[in-house]
Amino acid sequence: MIIESFEGYCQEVVIPALKEDAANGRWKSIAPSSFLTEKGQNYYVIFVDYVVENILVLRLSLCGVLEKNDTFVINCKCQFTNSVPDEEQRIEAIISNCYQEFVNMGFGASVGSNGLCVWASLSEEEGQYVVDGIEDPYDLYSTFIDIIETATKTL
């Protein structure tokens, strides 16, 4: 799959609660299918909402960085290089491949009834929030798109 373009817009949302897993120091989804919030935590959550024809819609949630919980809905216009038999199998393939690629890149991830949930903890350094060395949270757009392109290049 080749992602030809993407755009984002914001909306206020409530997002799934995440909890630090003390055993391995990674972020763990404690309720991937429910919608709860935990005060004072900073994290990203991505959902693969749906795929319609050649449009892949991702929902990227950002909590704790801005005054309100903002969601950036990323509409990716996709060109699938190979035909997948039906819509359901295509979505399953995208979710499966993206899950593995995000895990390989060091993100926390889980697959639940609401699709793919991907997260990364944020830390504040010198007044800026950083994720894996990316100072501006909005720069994660290109990182996410690169990961998705890699994960779906055989689809």
State what each model feature region is.
Residues 1-12, 132, 140-154:
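Acidic metal-coordinating catalytic centers involved in nucleic-acid phosphodiester chemistry
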Residues 1-59, 66:
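Charge-rich, low-complexity N-terminal segments
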Residues 19-37, 102-124, 146-155:
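Short glycine-rich, low-complexity/disordered patches
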Residues 47-132:
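Intrinsically disordered, low-complexity regulatory segments enriched in Ser/Thr/Pro
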